[in-house]
Amino acid sequence: MKIILWAVLIIFLIGLLVVTGVFKMIF
């Protein structure tokens, strides 16, 4: 169960980094 929570957290953080990178590229 804990592994699933860590996986979700890592995916969320990577997604956040990707969104931030896209924002910096556009603006």
From Swiss-Prot:
Outcome after substituting K2G: Protein mostly C-terminus inside. Both orientations found
A cellular component term, taken from the record's GO annotations: plasma membrane
Regulation: induction: Expressed in exponential phase, strongly induced in stationary phase and in minimal glucose or glycerol medium, in low oxygen, by SDS/EDTA (envelope stress) and by H(2)O(2) (at protein level).
Bilayer topology term: Single-pass membrane protein
Segments passing through the bilayer: 3-23
Gene name in the database record: yohP
Predominant location category: membrane
Localization terms from the record: Cell inner membrane
Superkingdom, natural source: Bacteria
Record's keyword terms, sorted: Cell inner membrane, Cell membrane, Membrane, Stress response, Transmembrane, Transmembrane helix
Protein name: Uncharacterized membrane protein YohP
